[in-house]
């Protein structure tokens, strides 16, 4: 607890451009959480280097992601918005937690198997111990809740296991985090393969709408979206392409599926795609305008980065010093 509020931690990697799915499914919902929680939102750039990155590109993407956090409406006075790499406690705690994590637990992580298959030429130790760094990210701030998707639930369970194991040995040190169950954001699927989630790493550039895509690009991608041969606009699982377009339309305009279906009754797929494209362009314009404004104010962004890193380090040190003392490290001389 901080300021009588439960603590919430979440973060995104700076390895690509955020998609409409990231925005509607997560980022848009983060904005309201600071009323109920003390929120830590990280640009998790340390996780990014488990796959080779061009240094200049990584720095550029990290800054762009932090700018998007702010443009989306996250208040840096109410939330702690920071680069993971600017808080040394993440790496320090991760090393200690490595010593309380079993090889067998890490071997069972499905994401390691998936990522190592995709990057067979670079199966490094960091990729293997990625879930331990994720555990450190969460436990460092004594997070009570963590918003996670199904693909990250296994990592959160490992985090809980590590925290409980450590507490059983040394006493009540870590808060054991729970999965955040709140307002469910829209689940946006690929425009080219509606059976899989819209992803910033999609090899098909037409499958994802990126938050900084210009209007012409957005309209073109929507027009090329996969549909079916039913020639009927209905919200049902049997028509995943149409259902996905309706989900996007509803999420952008705050409508229900029933309202959207009635609106497009008797119309063709072309009109639906046009309507979806226009809805996305309209929904993203305020965000894009705010990004453009923030990017011009380098001094302001730099001040946010500095102040929030210091705030995060302050809370991180409170946990880290306690953990270091518990495991037997010598106390620092002040």
Walk through the language-model features, giving the residues of each:
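Internal, conserved structured core segments that host functional sites
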Residues: 114-166, 170, 190
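Short helix-capping/linker segments at secondary-structure and domain boundaries
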Residues: 38, 103-107, 140-147, 251-260, ...
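Conserved nucleotide- and phosphate/pyrophosphate-binding catalytic cores
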Residues: 22, 154, 160-334
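Short, histidine-centered active-site or binding-site loop motifs used for metal coordination
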Residues: 12-14, 45-47, 144-145, 202, ...
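N-terminal Rossmann-like or analogous alpha/beta NTP/dinucleotide-binding catalytic cores
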Residues: 2-9, 14-136, 279-282, 292
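Short connector loops/turns at beta-strand edges and beta->alpha or beta->beta junctions
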Residues: 45-46, 135-139, 194, 251-254
